[in-house]
Amino acid sequence: DLIHQVATAISDEGRAKYHAALRRNGYTLQYQGLTFWSPNVNIFRDPRWGRGQETWGEDPFLTGEMASAFVRGLQGDDPQYLKAAACAKHYAVHSGPEKDRHSFNAIVTKRELYDTYLPAFKKLVTEAKVESVMGAYNRTLDEVCCASKLLLDDILRGEWGFDGHVVSDCMALSDFYLHHKVTEDAADSAALALKYGCDLGCDHVFNEIPTAIERGDTTEALVDRALE
């Protein structure tokens, strides 16, 4: 209940700042919008991870319960309109160490994946109805998280029925070719991300979508799907 109250206060203030910016300028800038990249529902089991304080600890059940209350408070209870848009991050199997996050390949068993790393995300998607999900920097089971058939197509949208938008972590799409070495360049990375359902990129990579279309690596239909 306390977490719900905290998130409600956050979204109250966020709404106020949003409307104030619109009245003053006619538009909003960074930190004046209604999309909140929170909560962080990664499981904190490695003390080397310097961002552990953002999470709710090592327990998947507790994390899911606390984060669900946060999402409901942030997004509000109107059946038609969102008060603000929450974002479940970082999807998935992202728990440090921070130094290796741009190139790390998380190898986990199916049991570890479903029992430890995914339950909080599932609860936010299927019960709290979180509006967005942020892909992690790392690879999971050899697939980059922001273009993972397993995580995005099969589980998130296939098993859980997620119908919100997927956003990359900032510069995660550049990691495809700079660190993970799974693509050749930015245009190739944009095509791969669109193919597996990353709708929004937090870096320059999606600026190369026209090049990817010209090459025949992606299609306008996939761009339209991301914009739906």
What positions do the PLM features span?
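Glycoside hydrolase catalytic-domain context in secreted enzymes
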Residues: 1-228
